[in-house]
């Protein structure tokens, strides 16, 4: 989900081999075109590039074994809906792997208007526990935090590093599984489907 030019998708395509299939979903036509070119250049015919959003994945229910998303959820407006969609397309027993930006507390309103903060993935992120809670609420089990990384330490922007420190923004790796007995995502309660960053 949010495949961009395809780094993760191409690695997955090599891992699953020619008998496996990788669906690479991205919203941006330019990124999809780059991914198609990169897959062709790598000789990987098992990558299918899909147009769409994380909140409405154009795949059938219970159709994939695993979903990865790397640095994307922080940019998705309705994170709970995106997680419910991921749950829907996973087969029972399927795995979710997330690498994204998490916070210790919400970003102050004055920073949310700064394009640099959006570009650096700070202002769209939520608290780590909220990610974990959303994953559990849609039905995932074995939800766990794997590791943390100080992603912003190498930012070229002093202001970004300052804001990241202020809100303890960091990269986190999470994983979860769809229960073997699962059939559909738990409904997202009205009023909680869209996260309020106000």
Predicted segments, located by residue:
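Class I SAM-dependent methyltransferase SAM/SAH-binding core
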Residues: 3-56
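C-terminal lobe and adjacent flexible extensions of AdoMet/dcAdoMet transferase-like proteins
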Residues: 138-198
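Short alpha-helix
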Residues: 124-139, 145
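A short glycine-rich, Lys/Arg-flanked "PGG" loop and its adjoining helix->strand segment in the class I
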Residues: 80-95
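Short, glycine-/aromatic-enriched active-site segment of Class I SAM-dependent methyltransferases
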Residues: 102-122
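A short SAM/SAH-binding and catalytic strip from SAM-dependent methyltransferases
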Residues: 65-78
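A short acidic, Gly/Pro-enriched loop at the edge of an enzyme's catalytic core
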Residues: 55-66
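Helix-to-beta-strand junctions that scaffold the AdoMet/dcAdoMet cofactor pocket
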Residues: 16-17, 76-77, 90-92
């Amino acid at each position: 989900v949010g495949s961009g030019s395809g780094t993760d998708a191409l690695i997955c395509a090599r891992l699953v081999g020619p008998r496996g299939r990788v669906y690479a979903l991205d919203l941006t036509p330019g990124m999809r075109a780059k991914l198609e070119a990169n897959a062709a250049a790598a000789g990987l015919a098992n990558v299918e590039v899909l147009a769409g959003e994380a909140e409405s994945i154009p795949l059938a229910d219970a159709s994939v074994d695993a979903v990865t998303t790397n640095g994307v959820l922080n940019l998705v407006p309705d994170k709970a809906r995106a997680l419910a969609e991921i749950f829907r397309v996973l087969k029972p027993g399927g795995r979710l792997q997330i690498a994204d930006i998490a916070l210790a507390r919400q970003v102050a309103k004055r920073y949310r208007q700064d394009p640099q903060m959006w570009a650096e993935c700070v202002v769209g992120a939520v608290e780590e526990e909220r990610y974990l809670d959303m994953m559990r609420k849609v039905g995932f089990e074995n939800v766990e935090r794997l590791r943390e990384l100080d992603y912003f330490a190498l930012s070229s922007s002093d202001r970004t590093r300052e804001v990241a420190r202020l809100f303890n923004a960091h990269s986190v790796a999470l994983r979860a599984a769809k229960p073997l007995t699962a059939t559909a995502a738990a409904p997202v309660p009205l009023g909680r489907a869209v996260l309020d960053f106000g």
